[in-house]
Structure formats: structure tokens, C-alpha cells
């Protein structure tokens, strides 16, 4: 199990070890740590057979033809905002799960889900900084909001208006701050008020 092959693209195409065009130190690191098969070509080439597309780029980067050539029942996170890499209505019938950064479609993935809770949790314990353990705690808290029996293709992440999210994130972030040693306030004996 686990991710075995990640292929990233930029405006030039696939990022791979040995590529010389439009590279910098970040892309060099990426090339050395992903794309083990050194896939080359455009985004349309490398998305063929892919299980997941995670877009963080620009509107219209992929189309329904690309979705048809992905693996069966692909997952598409088209995060460009306000216009995603592919519009959800264009993906209907071609994907198992679709998510965007937009509030007017199901499965909005937005950092507003984590920030109120992260800040509250950090402030509750007077954390000296926000570290990776606290960020992971926030992500896990968000993931745990939806019960397994509630999950379905249009409900993989809680709404930004779900009041449970900030409280759950704050509690888990505060715990992680104590466990990772960045809390500067003694842990309260009773639950910290939200």
C-alpha cells in the first residue's frame, strides 16, 4: 500500500531526474525524490493511467479526455481558485471523487478548515511555534470529523461551516503541542475551554 509514483508537472511538462529545461533547486529536489520511472511529456501524457490528479496550478489544465484516460474511478482534486483545473460539472461521470477549493461545490478543500483551530490550540497552551506534529494533529482531527459510515463521493471532508471542526482541531493541536514540547503553559487539569 501507499503512494509509489508521484509525477509533478510545471508549465514545461513532467519534472524528472535529468531534465535540464526550466529547472531550479526546488525542482531538482522534486525530480530526485519523485517520478521513479522518469516519465516525460506534458501533463496530458503523464496523467494517463493515473489514479489521482492533484492540481495546484491554473484553470483548464486538464479536460474530460484526460479523465477518460486515467485509471478507472480516479480521484481529482482540482484546487486552482476561483476556476479549477477542470470544472466539477465536466468531471461528472468520469471520476469517483471530485474536490475543489470552491465553496459552491461539494468537497471544498480550504485552509479555513484548519486555521481557527490551529490558532486556538496554540494559544491555549502558549505554544512557542506551530510545528509539524501540530499540523498533522490538525489534519487528523479534520479527517476524523466524518464518520466512516457518512463518507460518500460528495462528502469526503467536513464543511467549513461545521462547528465541530475548530473545536476538534484546537484540542488535538493543543495535545500535540504538549506532546512535542512546544507548549509553554502547564497543562490544565480540566478540559481547556474552547
Residue ranges and their predicted role:
Residues 1, 17-22, 65-67, 87-92, ...:
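Short acidic, glycine/serine/threonine-rich loops at helix termini
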Residues 1-58:
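Glycine-rich phosphate/diphosphate-binding loop of Rossmann-like nucleotide-binding domains
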Residues 2-6, 70-73, 94, 98:
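Secondary-structure transition/capping motifs at alpha-helix termini
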Residues 39-93:
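Long hydrophobic segments that form regular secondary structure
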Residues 78-187:
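Adenosine-phosphate binding glycine-rich loop
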Residues 187-194:
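Long, charged amphipathic helices and adjacent flexible linkers at domain junctions
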